């Protein structure tokens, strides 16, 4: 088709207009998605305050495309910021440019641990931060989980009236939850777990009618005070009002009381966790009538009875944990749980069970805990549990051999049969190797004896076989367990040396305590992953393996009662997580401090070097860097194997041996340097260790005075300074230590009266004997008899007489002195000074 010139021009114009229109639309659309300049500037300022680890945060690009940034497509305002777990570096301050983003609706800053990290100077008070966040009035979602925030929650947080999700868990706040939290009318999720809150929880939380998930776990809520949520009536009244709740977690507080019988009114409840409290009475049957309930955790309380009632076959309950309560001795038939057809996890430990031969549990059950259930026969119904993954039948009265069919269960991977009376295994020597993917086996505290069982080579991670009767050398077949990370063979009769093939293992935990093992501990047997080494009460000789210095995660070293001959292992200070050192009863020698040593053990909790041959003087600042003993707040490292096994150590407190297991290490802090040859003054810096519970410096050669500053050790329960060469008096300030139950100052050179304070006077007289100069109760020696008292009275009378004569003499000399003074004054002022001075000069 042919077009005229005019038509061609018209077509060109039309196409040009169309192109311009399209381009203008594109430009408008492009411009529409650019965030506003003030929003970009605020974000860029925030980036400059921290190191935001993203290459997309560039100043010449659309900030709405930056990682973690969401914008309103209509206004260009930033409405969402998600930088959770971004390793933001630096304290978030209350004047941060972040708070200029006034249109924010979602803010995720969780797991950035530097926000309130060090102190009130270079960190951030959580209260200040939340006060600033309280001005972001459009916020709907706020997550500051695990940011190391501290301080008090401000009431301004209640200004966030649009908030639906609030997560402040895993921080270090103080005080109580503010009443204003009840103003968050649209709140659906409230997570305040592990925040160190205490006391009253506001009843205003009962106003949160939309609340679906409530987590107040791992705090310190009690029933103290008339308005406290710890008062169970208040607690349940508030909870029962919130009929939208699906998740309730009140675990690990100090709540007390009884659960109400009408718990079924929480008809939407799916998850109910109250473990680790002090609830008592009966577990009401109404809990099992909630049709939506999926998980129920009531462990570690004081419940005494269980009311199951009629359980609907429509029950959705999958997890039921009842262990660790104080159930009465009435026998409960295991078959009452049979109607729970969806049950996959059942813990009934501590309940006196009847298990009939015909009992059957739901086939989907995967985790079964029957510990301490007074079972005397291996449960035969387990043979049909083809989905069983983990079995715990520890602490019962089962005798005989472990049945062969147990190892044929196809899904079984974790078995705990400890604390029974098993004496062997049915079937061939390799019967356990037929157990598929078995990764955890605990056969401790039985009466097993040789031969040691053959184990699955590829899957075994955790092996516990302590407190049995195994003997001979440690079997080299253990070295074939390539994936083994925990090996506990304590309290057997193993002898010989540690197999050198242990170098093939990558152990985190190696415990061989109380055997008859001997020889030099091989350097190559130390895995650089080692966190806990316990070889106490054996016959090892030689030196400590220096390869321990490569174990950067080492926390626990226990070598008590061996024949190890070495100098003090000061190189252990290089291990950043080191906490427990027990060298007691060996042949260590020499000084425990040398010039140039810093001996900075910031995390050390237990220091026991007693009964060795250490010598030398400790400088006054020796204990200054030991910060874990001077502060309550101290990070506790969590391990992937936590729950499988706990370290233990035997210590002396108040004259008695006591065993610390597991969490006892977090609160128990002790120093024992007794039975050595240390000398010089007791270091003043020891008074900085305010969390110290036991201090034993007895049977050394310490001299000088007892530091009065020991009265700063406000948590001290036991003090032993006996059998030294200490002189001077017993400081009366020690009587201010209200927890000090035992003290011993005997066999020193102390003198003077024993302080007459309650804490000191309650001690036995043997705590003060063999100090010739000490007197007063509880010793029979009085501080001065009758003759001495008479002499003292005579001295006082003589002193009084001398004072009287002095005053008389002063009075006699007073009058002529005044006359003489007046005469001399008259001479001086009457211009006869030269004559007077000439006369004076004749006598000088």
UniProtKB/Swiss-Prot annotation:
Pfam families attached to this UniProt entry: LRR_1, LRR_14, LRR_8, LRRNT_2
Region forming the signal peptide? 1-31
Ranges in the topological domain labelled Extracellular:
32-803
Q: Carbohydrate attachment sites?
A: 59, 95, 112, 159, 207, 262, 310, 374, 384, 416, 493, 516, 550, 696, 712, 744
Principal place of residence: membrane
The record's annotation in InterPro entries points to: Leu-rich_rpt, Leu-rich_rpt_typical-subtyp, LRR_dom_sf, LRR_N_plant-typ, LRR_R13L4/SHOC2-like
Spell out where the chain crosses the membrane: 804-824
What is the name listed in the Swiss-Prot or TrEMBL entry for this protein?
Answer: Receptor-like protein 49
Q: Where are the LRR repeats?
A: 102-126, 136-160, 161-183, 185-208, 209-231, 242-265, 266-290, 292-313, 315-339, 345-362, 363-385, 386-409, 410-434, 436-457, 458-481, 482-504, 506-527, 528-551, 553-574, 575-601, 602-625, 665-689, 690-713, 714-737, 739-762
What membrane topology term does the record carry?
Answer: Single-pass type I membrane protein
Q: Which gene encodes it?
A: RLP49
Which species does the entry assign this protein to?
Answer: Arabidopsis thaliana (Mouse-ear cress)
Q: Which family does it belong to?
A: Belongs to the RLP family.
Keywords tagged on the record = Cell membrane, Glycoprotein, Leucine-rich repeat, Membrane, Receptor, Repeat, Signal, Transmembrane, Transmembrane helix
Q: Where in the cell is it found?
A: Cell membrane
Cite the ranges annotated as topological domain Cytoplasmic. Answer: 825-844
Please tell me one Gene Ontology term that the record gives under cellular component. plasma membrane
